[in-house]
Amino acid sequence: MDNRFYFGFNTSEERKKRRKAELYSMSEQVSTFFWDEAPQHGLEMREGQQDMSFEIVDALINDQHFAIEAGVGIGKSFGYLVPVLLYSKRMNKPVIIATSTIALQEQLWRDVHAVMPLLGLNRDVILAKGQTHYLCNKRADEYMCDPKADPPDALKEGIQQGYEERKDFPEVLPQGVWDKVNVQRFSMKNCGSCEKKCKYYKVRASLKYTDGVVLCNQDFLTQHLMKLRRGQEGLINAAADLLVVDEAHNLDDKVRSATTERFGQGMLFGMIKSAFYELRSFDQSSVSGEKREAESAIIAFYNCLKAQVQKQINEAEQDMRYADRFFFDNNGSAIELLTEMNAAIHNLSSSIQIYSSMDFRNNRSFAASDDLDAVSESLSELLDRIDDMLIWIEQHGSNTELVYCPKNTKEIVSRLYFNGDERTILTSATLTNATSGSLEEQYSYFISNTGFPAGDRGCLSEPKPSPYPYDEHAMIYYCDDLPHPTREHEAFIEKGVERLLEILSISNGKALVLFTAKTDMEEVYSILSEKNLPYKILMQQPGSSQDKVLNEFKEDTNSVLLGTGAYWEGISIEGKSLSNVIIFRLPFPVPDPIIEYKCSVAKDALMDVRVPEMIIKLKQGIGRLIRNFTDTGIVCIIDRRLRDEPPERYHDITWDSLPIKNRTSSLGELRKFYEGLPSAKE
């Protein structure tokens, strides 16, 4: 539907009628594809997939946003790609598909190119990864020419071969080296001199004019929408009025991340050092006093933060050992010290700006001093709106960070994704937190986090269950006799490892063990490594290539892989290498400022926040086991809190939410079931 589509339809009402007629015609095309054409192409008929496509078209006809939980195996990517690609063609407009992982982006690239020929389409497709995935030629040249640098051969050879993305370079290239040569601070204005040789520049430029399919991450789409809502030019062609958010259970976290500011002590000292270097041709002694004052104020403020962190660690319950975020106490001297630090940074920045204005004829860059000025502006805004902000502290080794974001993430998500001219399709395998009640009740936690407009403006779909035969192919084992994992943590680790070894003996390895805390994972790995077990024990390594560890796990069929974080949802391993998923501890959220704020505004903190968070992550973890129609195996939950007697308040809602209904608390029954599986006999 290009400009010719509107010829003769001058009023808004006429255009709406013409658009709806086009969508009705598209609905017929979708039906024809699934009922007549897909079988001719040898595509497997999946009821949930077809229903999903038809419901998306209905939502578009009714001018509604649309949310759907689509179980593993229904083919949700094809389910939304068919109507979305046809929409792009018929309306001659770009469509944007955003995910939360690079793995799904790359899979969608393959899926789009598989679906288009089936529909007789040939749309432009742009894969827009985050900027740090791309080589910056300018930074690479500077690094290669730096006499103090020692560029590894993998980098030299890759550049000579013309590699432009991180995935092109060998895995042995250290991430620390890549961070010295990748794109870090892109802008169309400042990077214009590189437009002919920078792949990322070409990608960003093409996004402005495409009328095809844009595949990006949720962070990038959020930044695009934030610009549009501020009345600025977006990052993508503004004609795009259909958005798809896959892995939508992460959307509120991604939007929160996009609105989060963080300032570390090391970062601020680095800015001051760089700003002073920019004054190398001037008399630096004239601003050395302001520099000392700023550095002293920074040290005083961050020492206060470190003291707060240590106090919380000393006084906290066992759960605090898992914390990544610590609470910021704004009732003491911290606000006064923050105000003094901000004033000192502002004074230093103002003094440096005077020199930069004197040097305008030389057209030299004073980027670091501009950065200091931006820090001061951000901190001033924080102090002005402190009651509207969530503030916390993060500790990374010796570096301490002040981190903050607006409290009203729900309102921000709603304004960005549901209050513009665009219509948004949201999907995930884990959007619901209950299986009974009204659709609003089943999707209640998702709605509370995103402000999805259920009703006239938004359609909630009946969840589409996975077609996989879970109860024939899988069984869940749960414990009822172990120590409490938080109140009796040391005893839990000891007894939990003993139970883990019993479970591993049933499957002879072949297991993915999921942890909620890195410290638990490392402790269990240390214990298992000393046991001289008949299978290799692997562990997710910080900074290592995920592909390398996963490939080793796949190739060594009986190996055991310990993981946390992204391993709960970011991996897909088919076959008998993964025949046993072990949940070492129920994934309740760790108490932190974000969770505590959600709890503070909930009627029932446990049932309205902590349990839904746990259920969604537990469903993600269990979903690692059955990835196709032939996969079989067991899931083992080493946590007594799902025992039948005495039941916890969340006992029934948790069990009802899980796709595998076949369960036992007997290791003997578990062994008998596993030994009867085809994979155990191979």
Tell me what each language-model feature is.
Residues 57-58, 78-91, 111-115:
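Walker A/P-loop NTP-binding motif
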Residues 479-490, 541-643:
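Conserved RecA-like P-loop NTPase helicase motor core
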Residues 2-44, 91-214, 218-222, 281-289, ...:
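A substrate-engagement module of RecA-like helicase motors
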Residues 80, 86, 106, 110, ...:
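Signature of the SF2 helicase/ATPase Hel1-core->accessory helical subdomain module
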Residues 188-212, 222-233, 348-474, 479-480, ...:
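A contiguous, basic/glycine-rich beta-loop/short-helix subdomain that forms a polymer-engagement track
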Residues 482-516:
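Conserved interdomain hinge at the start of the Helicase C-terminal
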Residues 516-541:
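Conserved helicase motor "Helicase C" RecA-like lobe of SF1/SF2 P-loop NTPases
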Residues 62-82:
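Walker A/P-loop
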